[in-house]
């Protein structure tokens, strides 16, 4: 899909255990060079243009800020007209998710390596952002995945698969905190979003009391 970088559940931050972080970074670089940015009507295109000038300006400002801070990055090398809305995918190594201010709807990936002993603190930092739509974990240690699932404040949790593609009626979709508005779309509780509760309270004593109860008492 040509909007893969701007789906609400698209990957924005990847956390990689430090033991394999450098190897993963090198693989990521190779994979990124295969990405094709261009006309979304062409089957060979992976990523199309950013939606408007305001959006691409915000993304470019974020990229410029991280580059100015001297962050290590990898980027594809296609050239585009400066007036176009096309943008090369780019990945930055950063130290903490705290360095990201708000959502970045575009082809920007933030790469963070971590120590296993820091996992609990990592989850706390993620929760502290206030956003909680999707999270994915790749691990063969199911107890560790369960630990993350229990602590992470996210609406959709994926294990050993991609993090997009929720299907209405099969997998309810929705987030928590700043990423949620209540019941999940596609789930049984979603219907409650379309109804309004209404209560009726009657002071029966004002009209002489409840006739049925009074009659039963007389019996």
Q: Which residues fall in each region the model found?
A:
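Conserved C-terminal structural/oligomerization subdomain of aldehyde/semialdehyde dehydrogenase
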Residues: 33-36, 79, 86-219
């Amino acid at each position: 899909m040509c909007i893969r970088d701007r789906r609400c559940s698209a990957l924005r931050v990847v956390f990689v255990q430090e033991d394999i972080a450098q190897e993963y970074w090198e693989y990521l670089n190779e994979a990124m060079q295969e990405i094709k940015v261009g006309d979304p009507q062409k089957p060979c295109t992976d990523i199309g243009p950013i939606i408007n000038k305001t959006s691409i300006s915000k993304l470019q400002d974020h990229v410029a800020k991280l580059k100015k801070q001297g962050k290590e990055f990898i980027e594809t090398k296609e050239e585009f007209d400066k007036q176009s809305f096309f943008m090369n995918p780019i990945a930055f190594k950063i130290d903490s998710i705290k360095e990201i201010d708000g959502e970045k709807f575009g082809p920007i990936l933030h790469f963070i390596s971590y120590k296993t002993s820091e996992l609990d603190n990592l989850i706390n930092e993620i929760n502290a952002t206030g956003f909680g739509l999707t999270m994915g974990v790749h691990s063969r240690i199911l107890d560790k995945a369960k630990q993350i699932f229990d602590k992470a404040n996210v609406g959709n949790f994926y294990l050993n698969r991609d993090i997009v593609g929720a299907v209405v009626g099969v997998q309810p979709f929705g987030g928590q905190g700043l990423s949620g508005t209540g019941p999940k779309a596609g789930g049984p509780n979603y219907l409650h979003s379309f109804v309004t509760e209404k209560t009726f309270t009657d002071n029966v004593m004002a009209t002489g009391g409840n006739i049925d109860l009074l009659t039963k008492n007389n019996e």
